[in-house]
Amino acid sequence: MGACASGGCPVAEFLLGIPAWGWWAGAAGLFALWLAGQAWKREAFWSSLFYWTARAVCLAWFRLKYRMRVTGAENIPRKGGVVLCANHASYLDPPVLGCAAPHRLVRFMARRSLAKNKWLGILYHQLKAIMLDRDRGDLGALKAAIKRLKEGDAVGIFPEGTRSPDGTIQEAKGGIAFLLAKAAVPVVPMYIEGTFRAFPKGAKKFAPSRIAVTVGKPIPPEEILSAMPQKGDYAAAGALVMRRIAQLAPKDKP
C-alpha cells in the first residue's frame, strides 16, 4: 500500500504499460470464453428439453398402447452417479428404461454402428448418448461413461450388449462388466417384461403386449467389488448384476 500511495505501485505501472492491442486481445478472449459458456448452456438446455419431451411422448404411448406400469421406481436415487442396468430383448427397451426413471435424465450407452442411420445418429446426438464400439474393446467409451457417473449423471446400460434372440437373459459382456466394477457408484437392477412380445429382434411391426418394469434395490459398489474372487475378475461383477436382474423377473420366466 505504501508503494502505491507514493506513486510507485507496480500493479498500476503494469496495467498502464499494457498496449491498446493487449487490452483488445484480452477483452476478445474473455468474450470468446463467455460465448463458449453460453453455447454450452444452450446445448445442455436443448438436450435436456429434447430428452424430457421425448420421454413424455414415449411414456404416453407406452401407457396407452401397452398399459406400461413400473414397480419400485423409488429405488432409483434422485441424485448422484448411478448405473441403471436392465435386460435387453427389444429396441423398445431404452425408451422404456428412461420412462421408468421419473426423476433422472438418463444418458445411454449405445452401439456406435447404430448411429450410421441418419435419424438414429441425430437422436443419439441430441440425447448425448455414449457411443460404444462393441466389436473392439472401446476403453474410451467406458472411460467417458465413468466420467459421466463421477459427475453425478445416471447412465443406462444393457449389460448383455445386444438384444436377446429369444427373450431370455444372457451373460454380461466383458466391457460392461469392467464399467460396473470401475464406476464406484450404485447399480440399480431393472427387469423389463413385455417388450420382447411387443417388438422382438427381427420384427417389422409392433405386436400386442403389456409392458412392466420392476426396479430392484441399488447394489452398493462395495458389494460389486466383493463379488470378484480376485482383482480384475470383471465377469464375476457382471454375473452378480445379471443375477439381480433375473431375480426381478416373474416366477414363470427363465
Where do the protein language model's features map onto the residues?
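N-terminal membrane-anchoring alpha-helices
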Residues: 2-66
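Short, basic, glycine/proline-bearing loop/turn elements
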Residues: 57-59, 126-132, 159-162
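Generic structural signal for residues in well-ordered beta-strands
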Residues: 68-70, 129, 187, 213
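Glycine-rich, highly charged phosphate/nucleotide-binding loops
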Residues: 67-69, 136-142
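Catalytic core of membrane glycerolipid acyltransferases/transacylases, capturing the structured
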Residues: 45-52, 63-64, 77-136
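Short gly/ser/thr-rich secondary-structure transition/capping motifs
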Residues: 63-71, 196-197
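Non-catalytic C-terminal accessory region of glycerolipid acyltransferases
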Residues: 3-32, 140-254
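Short amphipathic alpha-helix with an adjacent loop that forms part of the alpha/beta core around
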Residues: 74-77, 146-147
